[in-house]
Amino acid sequence: MNEVFESYLTYSAGVRQFTKATIDSYKNDLIIFEEWLKELDLNIFELKASDIRIFIAELADKKIAPASINRMMSTLRGFYKYALRFNLTKMNPISSVRNLKLAQKLPVFMFPKQAQEFCRLPSNAGILWETRDAALFASLYSTGCRVSELAGLDIKDLDKTLSYAIVFGKGKKERKVFFAEFAKEYLREYLKERSDLVEKFKGQVQKDGKGKIRDTLFINQKAQPLTSRGIRYIIDRYVELSPELKHLSPHAFRHSFASTLITRGADIRVVQELLGHESVSTTQRYTHITAEQLQNLYKTAHPHS
């Protein structure tokens, strides 16, 4: 890979402290961009906005999804900001290039009853680790955490009464999230079993991707940290058992958390804080969900609808 791209990735990982998943995503985007530059024999620091638009058009011709193209543009914006900051260039060809318009899709979510039924699903399914999986689902729904945030949660981040936890979101921003009573019950049961399992595998120290010792809250059956990918796999296994929720994604727990709060009258700024959104406009997507819910309820219940 181009030396300048490599230095940008090193900077993003070390100074900006972006996650490994983010760095991997940036790397993939830059590899695609570099291949395109080589094909046309172009210099990265001599490009014009028109060149970037041609690159976008070629990606679209290859049926790359608009959201993926926009993500790639975000990667390039970050790179050129870095290049400008360290005087590698005086030009930013992407500054005037707009993102592609995306079709507005409402987030997939569960109603409270569905979410609680999903949390009870492991006890009847007889697959994987029932107690852990119930605690995992209840924690996702109760806190509104991202999957990556829950995977990054250590025992030390929990309040002693299990009332709340401190999580680290995007950009390493710290926030407090809360566990509902039903989630606390699932967690207490899981923590007992977890303690027994850790004792069984005593001596096999938990380590993260960087080799640092951890005491991760959610672990696999070998007492090692459960990764974001592992959590997604677990959710997918249970979704297979629920035909009515076949389109459910791991992020749906977070969507369900937000829509439940807003439906019950929570202030949108409070919901924004609990979700860790930088902009309230991101949180406002969930007001569209509740508006649709009300409309459907009206159609079902009103005699003259």
UniProtKB/Swiss-Prot annotation:
Keyword Transcription recorded: no
Location within or outside the cell: Cytoplasm
Q: Which residues form the Core-binding (CB) domain?
A: 1-84
* InterPro entries to which the protein is assigned, alphabetical: CB, DNA_brk_join_enz, Integrase-like_cat_sf, Integrase_catalytic, Integrase_recombinase_N, Integrase_SAM-like_N, Tyrosine_recombinase_XerC/XerD, Tyrosine_recombinase_XerCD
Which keywords does this chain's UniProt record carry? Cell cycle, Cell division, Chromosome partition, Cytoplasm, DNA integration, DNA recombination, DNA-binding
Q: What is its main location?
A: cytoplasm
One biological process term in Gene Ontology: cell division
Q: What are the Tyr recombinase domain coordinates in residue numbering?
A: 105-299
Q: Which GO terms describe its molecular function?
A: DNA binding; tyrosine-based site-specific recombinase activity
Would the keyword Ligase turn up in this protein's UniProt record? Answer: no
A matching Pfam family: Phage_int_SAM_1
Q: Which GO terms describe its cellular component?
A: cytoplasm
The entry's active site is: R146, K170, H251, R254, H277, Y286 (o-(3'-phospho-dna)-tyrosine intermediate)
Sequence similarity:
Belongs to the 'phage' integrase family. XerC subfamily.
The entry's function note states: Site-specific tyrosine recombinase, which acts by catalyzing the cutting and rejoining of the recombining DNA molecules. The XerC-XerD complex is essential to convert dimers of the bacterial chromosome into monomers to permit their segregation at cell division. It also contributes to the segregational stability of plasmids.
Subunit organization: Forms a cyclic heterotetrameric complex composed of two molecules of XerC and two molecules of XerD.
**Know the name of this protein?**
Tyrosine recombinase XerC
